[in-house]
């Protein structure tokens, strides 16, 4: 037990606590080949004005070192120079983790992108989060694309050889947005994917923002959530067992506490904020440790907030924009989350990992209480 505690403490110490920029969420294009009812970004889709590669290059050159780069959209694989964009941030900014959400409709392009990225640098990890928002026809209906379900499953299978080649450097995940259309079949979808696909993780996030379908798609009965969260928390533990199977018992235990405890903390924070604002158990660090860059160069502290500055106004010099008064004013408006609230897992996670209280108390506590909802 002493050995397990020592390993857990070392794991906590390896997680950075300094409140400086470490995660960038970059909407590389507004183009999308789906029509998702749950999309919070629908008003910005398929518009002109994507930044050019030259403009992105200047942004990267003037940005500090960051560890995590999310490449979103739109559908990020529609951007033809996506491989070059990844290379830019790896070479200029020392990115260690690239996280890409995708609808899985472009199988060949997705596979080539993953392979090209992982061949760049032996120290780079890539997390591909494939969207599945229901079982079978439900997924097609929510996504607005007939045949999407089958094409996405084919895309997942096509990535198995890369998973075998790159091992833990390539995390192949599924992400499900829970909404009024699919909450009743979360269990069926979760079991099907666990039993039939070689995934590293399957994550469930309640619908957020001003969606294309309006408020109707957000009408999940609150009474179904405890059972759902209990089920997906147990699923998270099973995936953790799969991911860490090769480790010795002590290491496997430590990683399980950290992983399952963190994901359960995400879910508990989302659950407590489902119907209305509830204070997070740690300060929100949006705009300090995270930045959101839109396809046209607008910059936001959080995906759910308005822009506080625009890169074209700073000649695409990210450093100048980041140090300007506009960001400081936005941080005062956010007030570490006291002045706004959300269920956005990206910001829950990044805020959590910069909080000693979260790491030393919330994560272990939520691991121990993972079955109680």
Can you say where each PLM-predicted feature lies in the sequence?
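Alpha-helical membrane-targeting segments
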Residues: 1-21, 242-273, 351-373
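Conserved alpha-helical substructure of the radical SAM core
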Residues: 2-125, 210, 220-224, 355, ...
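Short, flexible loop/turn elements at secondary-structure junctions
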Residues: 75, 102-104, 132-134, 176-178, ...
